[in-house]
Amino acid sequence: HWFGTDQLGRDIWARAWYGTRNSFLLGFCIALSDVGIGMVAGALWGYNRKLDPFMIELYNVMTNIPSTVYLVLLAYIMNTSYLTLFISMASRGWIVEARFFRNRILSIRDSEYNIASKCLGSSTWRIVTKNIIPQIISLIIMEAALCIPYSIGNEVFLGFVGVGMPVDAITLGNIVNLGRESFTQHPYQMLLP
C-alpha cells in the first residue's frame, strides 16, 4: 500500500488511480463539449455581426457570476451525479470558449479569401467550415488540452466542499474529502492523492 489505507482499509493508491481515471473521463467530456459548442458559437458569433450585441450581453451576464459560486449552487440544487457535474461545468464553459474563438475569427474574417468566397456566392456556413475553422484548428486543440485540467480542478474542488459526486463514487474530489476528515491523525490521506 504505497499511499497507505483509509479508515475502512481501502488502498488509497488504487483508489487514487481509479479516481484519476474517472476525473479524466469527466474532464475530457467537458472539454469536448465546451470546445465543440464554443467553437461553433464563436465561429457564428465572430462571422455574423447581428449576433454580436446579444452574445456580448450573454457573455457579460454569465461571466459576472463567479464560477465557483455558480458551480456550487448548481451542484447543490441538482442531484449529485456525473450528469449533474457535466451539465453544471459545460453550461458555463462554452461561452468563455466562444469568446476566445470569436476574437480569433474577427481577426481572419475579412481576409481576401473569405471576401472572394462571399463574392462567389458561398454561404456563411461554408465559409466558416471551409475557410475559418481550418485556420483555428491548432487553437481548438490547445483549448481542449487546457480545459481538461481546469475541469478536473473544479471536480476536485466540488468534491472537497462536499457537493460533488455521491460519496460512493470514486473521484479525486471524494478521496480528498474523505482524507480531510482524518487530516489531523493521517495527513497523507488528503495530501497524497
Task: Tell me the role of every PLM-derived stretch.
Residues 1-14, 162-163:
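Short membrane-interfacial helix/loop motifs at transmembrane-helix boundaries
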Residues 2, 6, 33-38, 43-47, ...:
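Generic hydrophobic transmembrane alpha-helix motif, especially the helices
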Residues 12, 16, 20, 24, ...:
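Hydrophobic alpha-helical elements at and bordering transmembrane segments
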Residues 12-44:
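Transmembrane alpha-helix signature in integral membrane proteins
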Residues 43, 72-76, 85, 89, ...:
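Transmembrane alpha-helix boundary and packing residues in multipass membrane permease domains
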Residues 49, 78, 82, 88-92, ...:
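C-terminal transmembrane helix and the adjacent membrane-cytosol boundary/short C-terminal tail
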Residues 75-79, 105, 153-192:
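Glycine-rich helix-loop "coupling/hinge" segments at transmembrane-helix boundaries
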